[in-house]
Amino acid sequence: MTELAKRYGGSLYELAAEENLTVELLQQLRTAVNSIEAEPQYLRLLSTPSVPKKERCALLDKAFEGAHPYLVSFLKLLCEEDLLGELPGCLRAYQDRYNVDHNILEVTAVSAIALTAPNREKLLAKLQKMTGKNIVLTETVDPAVLGGLRLDMDGTRLDGTVQRHLERLRTEIDGAVL
């Protein structure tokens, strides 16, 4: 995420917080990012210098007609400044600020097989106790980890996978003097 994305996304969050619209604008911002990412040609059109900015902004007005005026104005501002490519970073910055204000920690759990419901509940309870935060868990299945669990959260990786243990063992064996 660039500094520009942090600044713009953070500013939108501050405005939303002042107006008590953080949840609504977060959902609409996600929808906007997903829509624009799903249609890369649309982003190219909105970024084309040969199309006057006024017309590009009119396209945004039409595409996001039902969205909150703050979001539409935000998108138009990015368009006018030729910064629509920063929109995913703006969403990340907004989400980060939202998470801090709402004591939320996003965690990605990677395992060889899907977690069972009881294991998921135990993991959530342990993470909540360990961090004191509300956990939003994203699960990913990757057979390459062979077994165990890898957790990525807030820039920290806790790796208890069989794959990692084998890598560590391989490194120790390679470093051993024979």
Language-model segments: what does each one mean?
Residues 1-178:
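Elongated, mostly alpha-helical coiled-coil "stalk/stator" tethers of large membrane protein machines
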